[in-house]
From Swiss-Prot:
Ranges per topology, Extracellular: 49-163, 331-360
Record PTM Phosphoserine, positions in chain: 241-242, 246
Protein's recorded name: Volume-regulated anion channel subunit LRRC8D
Recorded catalytic activity of this chain's protein: chloride(in) = chloride(out); iodide(out) = iodide(in); taurine(out) = taurine(in)
Top-rank lineage group of the source organism: Eukaryota
Residue ranges of LRR repeats: 514-534, 538-559, 561-582, 589-609, 612-632, 636-657, 659-680, 684-705, 707-728, 730-751, 753-774, 776-797, 799-820
Organism: Rattus norvegicus
Length: 858
């Protein structure tokens, strides 16, 4: 047999789940325990004391003659009256006995013989027989026959509900218990509930929750202009229990001290007593991450809500079923029953009168059970009314938003909303504290505090370095925000912020008087009004790297004193079919615009800065640039770079740029440059870069571009150099590296102003003597060719500082290299074995590039 405690354990849940048990569930749990006690009590009584007692219904005296027990044909049917003897004992006491005879319970002896035997045995009683009245009737049944009849009538005459009521009540109660707590046991919902309760308890006990709510209280007091006097200490409650459930009852109340924090309002000074330590901050940040992931996981489905509705419907249907059939059996339970077991051949009687000793008790227990189940059912109906009266799959934190400064707490839905509704039935303070961890403002404030703890002024100072321009530079990468101490580095020149999505630039940036360059790499920084005013007046160079054009901060287009703007990102993605740059009209002093993107046309907004723009760079990452009409309006552009734009010819719009000085068309698909003759109208053009294309020949018309000083044709498919190139008397730099050129024309000697010649990666085998007439050469790169010997006239290049010979067929170097006084070992690129062929004094002269300056100093 089981105990009450063992069965009641079906109704037990983890103590931490009690926050998800509204009052009706708790009440129904107690009612289920009472019903369980009724069922077990009734079952115990029935097993121990349930009994049916039956007596045969004897024929009446008037009909006794017609009654003859089977098997005794000679038995007299007259039922004699029972005699009572009252003999006196020796002490004078009188006893009353009923004279049944010794054969009264012997069915095989005829009644007449029994009476005759009695008369012969007790002759003295015969004279008193007529004077006494009969007090009972004989049945002639044996004890075993009574037991047999009792068992037969218990199963035949007794209603089934009287026999099985305790067991049915027990089964029904167990089903109700299981139905009430099934959502706590079902694996797919149990895991979510367990996770939710764990997070909820941690959020309730978190010092950050206490701090945040304290800030809210402080803000309310500020708004109401209520002065708080006295220094009150905000207690910080940290749970040391291993249980991750609901918070302890000893959680301290929240004092109205701290600082005011609002997403839209300035933050007042933070008292040191409310600052979280590093451990508390890390725990709070972990909670924000857990809440975010849990919300994303639970909001996807409404399984918990549906399961709770289903189990409530099951309990309601169970209540209706129990009430319907039990009400019909209340009157069926009675004390007396008539039994006709059809065992006349065994007992001699056909009808028996029986009594059920547990009838009154069972009837009272049944009425009690029905009363309890009615109360249980009404609560189920109320639960259904509550479930369908309000939208439980939506939960609004509107009240919390009104009472606190966290106006960004989002509304939730589905199972997440349902769980919060259930928690509100327990205590609304849980949801209020939980909402703090749904607020991005709260999370950002926590990150800001933790960030300022970690990145102190001293630590930031250690990360300051000097860049190639000898400027002090600070690079911050993948932080949760910009530390406040950054703005105390007043001597900083360059600030780089990379992958800081929540970057905010406060008014303190106005202290950084030396700051002129700012880098925002995937960092849509927000600025305060005072900070914007400072940047607008002082910032000179801005680099913005983005994935989508929406990441470009709007204030970028309002920096009126900006000189250089670098935009690197996708301006023509699927989400941005049209160019997304805003108007650049406010950039009144912009001189350099660098755009690295995937444009299909030159943005028309660029014309807003046309009057003062001097340099335009477009790196298109292989996307074909189709429309360049806007270039015609860039009349003051001196430098133009169109790289990786898949251009097949030189755009005609370029020929309208009368002030153009440098043109770079690197990494396109240009094959012919017949339009080069049009460059003669660009009187100021001095540098032409057509490198990394597919050009197979340089047209003779290049001779008309007489002002060219630099010409780059490297990484093309040139097989020869036309004589016209050498008519450019102002040419100072000629780069034809990595082509298929096999000979250098002797006309190269005409380039008297040539200072840099690059022929690396060709098929040149002989160097013409006229080359060495270019006495102003400083750089001569001849590597990776087929040159077999270096002429001794190399000595004429007295200004040579760099000579590349590596990758040729040379077997020795001429000693005349020593006469190139400006050439040093660092500028000579050659194999080590070739360098060793030089005379010792030449090698020593070449090695003096390091020692000579120090020697002169000494």
């Amino acid at each position: 047999m089981f105990t009450l405690a063992e069965v009641a354990s079906l109704n037990d849940i983890q103590p931490t789940y009690r926050i998800l048990k509204p009052w009706w569930d708790v009440f129904m749990d107690y009612l289920a325990v009472v019903m369980l006690m009724v069922a077990i009590f009734a079952g115990t009584m029935q097993l121990t004391k349930d009994q049916v007692v039956c007596l045969p219904v004897l024929p009446s005296p008037a009909n006794s003659k017609a009654h003859t027990p089977p098997g005794n044909a000679d038995v007299t049917t007259e039922v004699p009256k029972m005699e009572t003897a009252t003999p006196q004992d020796q002490n004078g006491q009188t006893t009353n006995d009923i004279a049944f005879g010794t054969s009264a319970v012997t069915p095989d002896i005829p009644l007449q013989a029994t009476y005759s035997h009695a008369e012969s045995t007790f002759p003295s009683q015969e004279t008193k027989k007529e004077k006494r009245d009969p007090t009972g009737r004989k049945t002639n049944l044996d004890f075993q026959q009574y037991v047999f009849i009792n068992q037969m009538c218990y199963h035949l005459a007794l209603p089934w509900y009287s026999k099985y009521f305790p067991y049915l009540a027990l089964i029904h109660t167990i089903i109700l218990m299981v139905s009430s707590n099934f959502w706590f046991k079902y694996p797919k919902t149990c895991s979510k509930v367990e996770h939710f309760v764990s997070i909820l308890g941690k959020c309730f006990e978190s010092p950050w929750t206490t701090k945040a709510l304290s800030e809210t209280a402080c803000e309310d007091s500020e708004e109401n202009k209520q002065r708080i006097t006295g220094a009150q200490t905000l207690p910080k409650h940290v749970s040391t229990s291993s249980d991750e459930g609901s918070p302890s009852a000893s959680t301290p109340m929240i004092n109205k001290t701290g600082f005011k924090f609002s997403a839209e309002k300035p933050v007042i000074e933070v008292p040191s007593m409310t600052i979280l330590d590093k451990k508390d901050g890390e725990q709070a940040k972990a909670l924000f991450e857990k809440v975010r992931k849990f919300r994303a996981h639970v909001e996807d489905s409404d399984l918990i809500y549906k399961l709770y509705v289903v189990q409530t419907l099951i309990k309601t249907a169970k209540f209706i079923f129990i009430l319907c059939y039990t009400a019909n059996f209340v009157n069926a339970i009675s004390f007396e029953h008539v039994c006709k077991p059809k065992v006349e051949h065994l007992t001699g009687y056909e009808v028996f009168e029986c009594t059920h000793n547990m009838a009154y008790m069972l009837k009272k227990l049944l009425i009690s059970y029905i009363s309890i189940i009615c109360v249980y059912g009404f609560i189920c109906l109320y639960t259904l009314f509550w479930l369908f009266r309000i939208p439980l799959k939506e939960y609004s934190f509107e009240k919390v938003r009104e009472e606190s400064s966290f106006s960004d707490i989002p509304d939730v839905k589905n199972d997440f909303a349902f769980l919060l509704h259930m928690v509100d039935q327990y205590d609304q303070l849980y949801s209020k504290r939980f909402g703090v961890f749904l607020s991005e403002v709260s999370e950002n404030k926590l990150r800001e505090i933790s960030l300022n703890h970690e990145w102190t002024f001293e630590k930031l100072r250690q990360h300051v370095s000097r860049n190639a321009q000898d400027k002090q530079e600070l690079h911050l990468f993948m932080l949760s925000g910009v530390p406040d101490a950054v703005f105390d580095l007043t001597d900083l020149d360059v600030l780089k912020l990379e992958l800081i999505p929540e970057a905010k630039i406060p008014a303190k940036i106005s202290q950084m008087t030396n700051l002129q360059e700012l880098h925002l790499c995937h960092c849509p920084a927000k600025v305060e009004q005072t900070a914007f005013s400072f940047l607008r007046d002082h910032l000179r160079c801005l680099h913005v790297k983005f994935t989508d054009v929406a990441e470009i901060p709007a204030w970028v287009y309002l920096l009126k004193n900006l000189r250089e703007l670098y935009l690197i990102g996708n301006l023509n993605s699927e989400n941005n079919k049209m160019i997304g740059l805003e108007s650049l009209r406010e950039l009144r002093h912009l001189k350099i615009l660098h755009v690295k993107s995937n444009l299909t046309k030159v943005p028309s907004n660029i014309t807003d800065v046309a009057p003062h723009l001097t340099k335009l760079v477009i790196h298109n990452d292989g996307t074909k640039l189709l429309v360049l009409n806007s270039l015609k309006k860039m009349m003051n552009v001196a430098e133009l770079e169109l790289q990786n734009c898949e251009l097949e010819r030189i755009p005609h719009a370029i020929f309208s740029l009368s002030n153009l000085q440098e043109l770079d068309l690197k990494s396109n698909s240009i094959r012919t440059i017949e339009e080069i003759i049009s460059f003669q109208h660009l009187k100021r053009l001095t540098c032409l870069k057509l490198w990394h294309n597919k050009i197979v020949a340089i047209p003779p018309s290049i001779t008309h571009v007489k002002n060219l000083e630099s010409l780059y044709f490297s990484n093309n498919k040139l097989e020869s150099l036309p004589v016209a190139v050498f008519s450019l008397q102002k040419l100072r730099c000629l780069d034809v590296s990595y082509n298929n050129i096999s000979t250098i024309p002797i006309e190269i000697g005409l380039l008297q102003n040539l200072q840099h010649l690059h022929i690396t990666g060709n098929k040149v085998d002989v160097l013409p003597k006229q080359l060495f007439k270019c006495v102003k050469l400083r750089t001569l790169n001849l590597g990776q060719n087929c040159i077999a010997s270096l002429p001794e006239k190399i000595s004429q290049l007295s200004q040579l500082t760099q000579l590349e010979l590596k990758g040729n067929c040379l077997d020795r170097l001429p000693a005349q290299l020593g006469q190139c006084r400006m050439l040093k070992k660092s500028g000579l690129v050659v194999e080590d074995q070739l360098f060793d062929t030089l005379p010792l004094e030449v090698k020593e002269a070449l090695n003096q590039d390091v020692n000579v300056p120090f020697a002169n100093g000494i």
